């Protein structure tokens, strides 16, 4: 647990294959091979659904709290990586190399963060408004 500015809490665990702190610091971006493997898995899931009559498949990824509210992260740890984050790198890979409809919602949700709080201050999850705005985007895209 990291206590940020204005007492915002950030949970930065390390668990199998994941390291939220390294994600925030941009030190563990996916390799080209890892991106290709993940993209292939998503395409297989899409194909499974399409083979069963689903007419539309769109894969969404919501950003984490550290991404949207980095202004509340404490002075340390600093971002030390150069360039894009892990998910930004993967989103670019998907756009350039995959025919799966894919959307990383960072830019879309960021425009709401100046006016609204989309994540809980003392929790890692989106609040109801963040969930609603995300859901509305999905419904809008699917209709």
Model regions: which residues?
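Extracellular glycan-modifying ectodomains
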Residues: 1-143
């Amino acid at each position: 647990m990291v206590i940020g500015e204005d007492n915002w809490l950030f949970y930065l665990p390390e668990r199998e294959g994941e390291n939220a702190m390294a994600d925030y610091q941009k030190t563990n971006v996916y390799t080209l091979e890892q991106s290709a493997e993940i993209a292939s898995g998503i395409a297989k899931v899409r194909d499974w659904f399409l083979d069963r009559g689903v007419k539309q498949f769109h894969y969404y990824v919501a950003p984490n709290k550290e991404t949207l509210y980095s202004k509340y992260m404490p002075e340390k740890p600093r971002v030390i990586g150069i360039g894009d984050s892990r998910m930004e790198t993967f989103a670019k890979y998907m756009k350039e190399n995959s025919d799966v409809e894919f959307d990383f919602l960072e830019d879309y949700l960021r425009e709401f963060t100046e006016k609204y709080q989309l994540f809980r201050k003392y929790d890692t999850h989106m609040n109801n408004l963040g969930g609603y705005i995300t859901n509305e985007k999905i419904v809008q895209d699917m209709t």
